Regions:
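Outer-membrane beta-barrel signature, preferentially recognizing the C-terminal barrel domain
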Residues: 162-165, 169-171, 175, 179, ...
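C-terminal beta-signal and adjacent terminal beta-strands/loops
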Residues: 194-195, 254-255, 259-264, 389-430, ...
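Transmembrane beta-strands of outer-membrane beta-barrel proteins
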Residues: 1, 96-102, 139-143, 186-188, ...
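Transmembrane beta-strands of outer-membrane beta-barrel pores
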Residues: 3, 104-110, 117, 123, ...
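Face-selective signature of the C-terminal outer-membrane beta-barrel domain
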Residues: 1-157, 245, 304-309, 324
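Gram-negative outer-membrane beta-barrel transporters
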Residues: 98, 135, 239, 247-252, ...
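Residue-level signature of outer-membrane beta-barrel architecture
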Residues: 88-90, 121, 127-132, 137, ...
């Protein structure tokens, strides 16, 4: 279809929806989508290609016109978690210490949506050695070996040792902490990481108010390492005392697990990634769903720095001010973004899903800057406090939600987004997000009094300035709220 014909066609679709549902809100569309996700489409949708109407079209339309009345009953998930840990610790007079142990965890999950039972076992053996030298240097080193299985997949992780594969994955960590002077500390650490996908990430199928979670049987374990260098300094000036801390960090992942929103075929739970997939979904007659699926990002690098300070200013024996301030700078980079962009530039199918909303180098759903401040003034039995949180804009989101790339005409997915997410007073999800994806700050206040030794009251105002902000598409921050809390100690 040409862009003009496509525009005329979709304008007709939206006009028809407005005529059928003249007073529909975004919540109504969510009810409708949820109903279609649960009940599917009319049977034999493939017959429409031959001009034949499905035999159950009339009752299906009745459900569409009143999705709340025809909602399916709630399906309950059940989860059982059994955890056992044994730890042995031994100290010597010379400052050495060894900690070793075994951990076992068994998880059994029943999905009400698929009526399937999945089980996992995680066994780990670990050992850590700690030693202090010259009353200034602390050394720590450890190793942990893990075995993991889900259902009948008994070798979720393999390690090659002398040419043979064993079903255990070892990870190592080490750290140093050196006291340079009184209240001055230098530290460094290095640690490997390895995490198997959970039952939730691999097998979960759930529908929550029109948004689903879909399984990915092919998701792989994520692995990587983290390194940190930090300096901590104590300070005291008159009645003011506290600590300041500066740290730089670097983390690298391979096959990092992230979630991706998209459209799915409810017949086989696969992601709809082409017009052919959409036609097959119509033929299957089980309907579509919008939701998230966990998948692997080939390589990611996250580095940055953190600056923080906490302490106390004492006015007199009855009054003091406690504070905690922190700033974090992060560079969350997708190391393979150039290769992915080159591949996505070859896409020709109008329904083919891209990784994220832009061609940038950053991972999804992460800001670059964040700042947090907590202040508490205490006077006898009364305390007054405030929290200030500031975050910079989100760097990228999922492609199904919006496309930030420049284009001369809307494409097919832009119209699909309009149908999926609706609009309110001319405001679409994309336009609202572009307007509100900015730096934002929120302020919370609290006032408390300790009535007796056992009873305390606290009055809180969250989002004092009633700031309207959005920390991701379809998630608007709560408006100003008032909370009264009573604590009783027995």
């Amino acid at each position: 279809l040409g862009s003009d014909k496509l525009s005329d066609l979709m304008d007709g679709v939206f006009g028809s929806l407005d005529n059928i549902f003249p007073n529909a809100t975004t919540a109504d569309y969510c009810d409708l989508i949820s109903w279609v996700m649960s009940n599917g489409l009319p049977s034999d949708m493939g017959g429409l290609l031959e001009g034949k109407l499905p035999s159950d079209l009339v009752p299906w339309l009745s459900g569409v016109l009143n999705p709340k009345r025809n909602q399916s009953p709630t399906r309950t998930d059940k989860n059982y978690d059994y955890y056992l840990d044994y730890q042995f610790n031994k100290k010597w007079d010379g400052g050495a210490q060894i900690t070793t142990g075994l951990t076992y965890e068994h998880i059994r999950t029943f999905s009400g949506e698929t009526e399937e039972v999945h089980q996992s076992d995680n066994v780990a053996a670990y050992m850590q050695y700690d030693q202090r030298f010259w009353d200034r240097l602390s050394v720590s080193a450890g190793v942990r070996a893990e075995y993991y299985r889900i259902d009948k997949h008994y070798r979720e992780a393999d390690t090659k040792v002398f040419g043979s594969k064993i079903p255990f994955r070892p990870v190592f960590r080490a750290g140093l902490n050196y006291q340079l002077a009184d209240y001055s500390f230098l530290r460094t650490s290095f640690g490997q990481g390895y995490r198997n996908p959970s039952i939730t990430e691999k097998y979960l199928r759930k529908d929550i108010g029109g948004v689903g979670v879909y399984p990915n049987y092919n998701v792989q374990p994520e692995k990587g390492f983290n390194a940190e260098l930090g300096f901590k300094q104590g300070y005291k000036a008159g009645n003011l005392q506290g600590f300041a801390d500066v740290a730089a960090f670097y983390t690298q992942y391979k096959d990092m697990v992230e979630f991706q929103f998209g459209l799915f075929n409810n017949a086989d739970l696969s992601m709809i990634n082409s017009v052919t997939d959409a036609i097959q979904m119509l033929k299957n007659g089980k309907g579509f769903g919008i939701g998230a699926q966990f998948h692997n990002v080939s390589k990611a690098q996250i580095y940055g720095m953190e600056i923080s300070t906490n302490g106390m200013y004492t006015f007199n024996k009855n009054a003091k001010l406690l504070y905690n301030l922190g700033y974090v700078y992060t560079e969350p980079r997708d190391a393979d973004y150039k290769k992915r962009n080159a591949l996505e530039n070859t896409y020709t199918d109008p329904l083919q899903m891209k990784e994220k909303s832009n061609d940038g180098k950053y991972l999804k759903y992460r800001p670059k800057h964040s700042f947090k401040a907590t202040l508490d003034f205490q006077w006898k039995r009364i305390n007054i406090g405030a929290n200030v949180n500031w975050k910079s804009k989100m760097l990228a989101v999922d492609y199904i939600m919006l496309d930030e790339r420049s284009k001369s005409e809307p494409d097919l997915l832009d119209y699909v987004r309009g149908i999926l997410f609706g609009s309110s007073n001319g405001e679409t999800l994309a336009s609202y997000w572009k307007k509100h994806n900015t730096d934002y700050a929120t302020v919370d206040m609290r006032f408390g009094v300790k009535a007796t030794k056992e009873v305390a009251f606290q009055f809180m105002i969250n989002n004092l300035l009633n700031k309207e902000y959005s920390y991701r598409p379809m998630a608007v921050g709560a408006p100003r709220t008032f909370v009264v809390k009573m604590d009783v100690t027995f």
